[in-house]
Amino acid sequence: NEYQTYLTDRNPQCILNEPLRTDTVSTPVSGNELLEAGKECDCGAPANPCCDAATCKLRPGEQCAEGLCCDQCRFMKEGTICQEAKGDWNDDTCTGQSADCPRNGFYG
């Protein structure tokens, strides 16, 4: 399929980059799976062990509530693969400082 070949060969960032969950302009709403201004985590599910459902803030001592580089409320170690390589691109790895999985943008 030409579309899949294009994505693999060209790796177009305008299509493949997922917007940050913090890049929203809506009014904060609990449980909408978005991280609007004033929220540290989406507090829709009281069962989330990382997020206080009453305040939408991380529980004391926790670093993150979700993300490809978040495991059990902690940032994954620097260098942990969060997205395997596609085509000629290298693996994307965690920074150890964030729950987000940054695209490295380098060819292998």
UniProtKB/Swiss-Prot annotation:
EC number from the UniProt entry: 3.4.24.-
Name recorded for this polypeptide: Zinc metalloproteinase/disintegrin
Tissue distribution of the protein: Expressed by the venom gland.
Uppermost EC category: hydrolase
UniProt subcellular location: Secreted
Motif Cell attachment site: where in chain: 86-88
Peptidase M12B domain mapped to chain residues: 1-19
Subunit structure: Monomeric (disintegrin).
GO CC terms: extracellular region; plasma membrane
Domain Disintegrin, first and last residues per copy: 27-108
Gene3D superfamilies the record matches: Disintegrin domain
Protein origin, superkingdom: Eukaryota
Record-level GO BP terms: proteolysis
Keyword annotations of the record: Cell adhesion impairing toxin, Disulfide bond, Hemostasis impairing toxin, Hydrolase, Metal-binding, Metalloprotease, Platelet aggregation inhibiting toxin, Protease, Secreted, Toxin, Zinc, Zymogen
Cofactor: binding comment: Binds 1 zinc ion per subunit.
Record carries keyword Metal-binding: yes
Lineage: Eukaryota, Metazoa, Chordata, Craniata, Vertebrata
Family designation: Belongs to the venom metalloproteinase (M12B) family. P-II subfamily. P-IIa sub-subfamily.
Additional facts recorded: The disintegrin belongs to the medium disintegrin subfamily.
Gene Ontology MF annotations: metal ion binding; metallopeptidase activity; toxin activity
Propeptide: 20-35
Disulfide cysteine pairs (residue numbers): 41-56, 43-51, 50-73, 64-70, 69-94, 82-101
Cofactor(s) required, per the database record: Zn(2+)
